[in-house]
Design a protein with these regions (language model features):
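Catalytic-pocket segment enriched in acidic/His residues
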Residues: 1-117
Length: 117
């Protein structure tokens, strides 16, 4: 954390396979001070408010992706067709960020795609 951006990788897995580890601060267009200022123009913010920065991606493609649509678009541009499948019933997505000592910052978020009953 540099006061405006978190500079750690977001570990993303899809179907139990590594999908990406983009660095959250690298290539971030708007820092959190700018995001909070913008959000505060249209609503009250209180302690505990959560402000999201949108999807995370890096210019350096070797870091992988945190967004299936972004990856499919890059594949379309590179090869003429998307390769990565969309999520299907039974698929699991997991994201987690670890600090420099390997401790989870916010706990892993893991969700499974299931049919509504």
């Amino acid at each position: 954390w540099d006061g405006r951006r978190v500079h750690l990788p977001l570990r993303c897995t899809v179907r139990g396979e590594a999908f990406g580890q983009p660095d959250c601060g690298t290539d971030m267009v708007f820092d959190f001070a700018q995001l909070i200022a913008h959000v505060a123009k249209t609503r009250d913010l209180e302690a505990g408010s959560i402000v999201g920065s949108g999807t995370i991606s890096n210019v350096d493609r070797s870091k992988g992706s945190a967004c299936i649509v972004e990856r499919r678009t890059l594949e379309q541009l590179d090869t003429g067709k998307p390769i990565t499948p969309y999520l299907d019933f039974g698929d699991t997505v997991r994201i987690e960020m670890l600090d420099n000592d390997g401790r989870s910052i916010f706990g892993a978020i893991e969700q499974k795609v299931e049919r509504l009953a």
